[in-house]
Amino acid sequence: MYLFQERIYNFGAGPAMLPNEVMEIAAAEFLNYKGSGMSVMEVSHREPLFEDVITEAEILLRKLLNLGEDYSIAFFSGGATLHFSALPLNLLKEGESFDVAHTGIWTKKAWEEGLKFNEVNVIYDSTNNHFTDVPVLTDSNLSGKGKYLHITSNNTIYGTQYPEIPKIKQIPLVADMTSELLSRKIDVKDFGVIFAGAQKNIGPSGLSLAIIRNDLLGISGRKIPILLDYSVMVKNRSLYNTPSTYSIYIAKLVFEWLLKLGGIEAIEKVNEQKAKLIYDFIDSSSLYVCPVQKRARSKMNVVFLLKDKNLDSKFLDEAEKNGLHGLGGHRLVGGFRASIYNSMPLTGVQKLVSFMKDFESKI
């Protein structure tokens, strides 16, 4: 039984909070979308009513990212993990390899999945620093054999983030941006492929998207499972089969919300303010500590520990009672994690820091 009659602050890593404004629009349109007498989730993906939704979603995303016509967008049913299989199949011929900078669980999963199809060259491994830092990568770090470089730009579990996107010129840069896409300004031309699960900054779970430079489509010559084939999905405008229609609709609303705020430039300033507020407090505290190197601290996932682990359960229990949900760290690392994606308002972080101060004062 839930104790709260109003919305709480969800700091979970994902599925994450959605903007209240988006939820209100979705609720208002749920039973009768644009006078159709149907919910969006009931509309056929072949009807013009939904085709307008997916077309508008792509237009809005292109506007947010200043995306040129030399890149294509495709929406997929399923999370970012499916791209761990899709990428080598789409980008590599048999016998070729790719490079990976290993900075956490998600690069390890991409590496392991890639080995089912091709060789993988690990050009950086942050295991020895316990995944508390990320590398500064240039062409000089490349293996010389790989056809692309795979990175995870923000690591949700360990709370690390590339402060600057690597400038790789010799081969395409492929980035898993699941937990940070649309949170800060990027130059898409720095990438060959960007992919992301939706459940952090884009929309509900069960949806992912890929942004693919057009010259990388159809280059492998391999037999690719149809729903993993980037060329097929692009050619069919993500409508080869029934897509995650309602998730795409929510993503469209999120894109509209973000543009209304002022776009990525505006939300980046808010995200920097939120991250600074919580990191500054942690660094000044005698109870809390952040294990991540300062240069590599994520602005999306703030990882921290209590110096007295005996207080962990008490901290979580009291946080929940105060409407601060999902602060437990990942099961592999423990501790705590505050995920402060785009939809987390500044007031949520202010309330969290106030609670943390109050909790410390009572110890």
UniProtKB/Swiss-Prot annotation:
Pathway: Amino-acid biosynthesis; L-serine biosynthesis; L-serine from 3-phospho-D-glycerate: step 2/3; Cofactor biosynthesis; pyridoxine 5'-phosphate biosynthesis; pyridoxine 5'-phosphate from D-erythrose 4-phosphate: step 3/5
GO molecular function: O-phospho-L-serine:2-oxoglutarate aminotransferase activity; pyridoxal phosphate binding
Catalyzed reactions per annotation: O-phospho-L-serine + 2-oxoglutarate = 3-phosphooxypyruvate + L-glutamate; 4-(phosphooxy)-L-threonine + 2-oxoglutarate = (R)-3-hydroxy-2-oxo-4-phosphooxybutanoate + L-glutamate
Positions annotated to bind pyridoxal 5'-phosphate: A80, T81, W106, T156, D176, Q199, N241, T242
Binding site for L-glutamate: R46
Spans through the membrane: none
Modified residues (N6-(pyridoxal phosphate)lysine): K200
Keywords, alphabetical: Amino-acid biosynthesis, Aminotransferase, Cytoplasm, Pyridoxal phosphate, Pyridoxine biosynthesis, Serine biosynthesis, Transferase
Matching HAMAP family: SerC_aminotrans_5
NCBIfam families: PRK05355.1, serC_1
Subunit structure as annotated in this protein's UniProt entry: Homodimer.
Function: Catalyzes the reversible conversion of 3-phosphohydroxypyruvate to phosphoserine and of 3-hydroxy-2-oxo-4-phosphonooxybutanoate to phosphohydroxythreonine.
Protein's UniProt name: Phosphoserine aminotransferase
Species whose genome carries this gene: Leptospira interrogans serogroup Icterohaemorrhagiae serovar Lai (strain 56601)
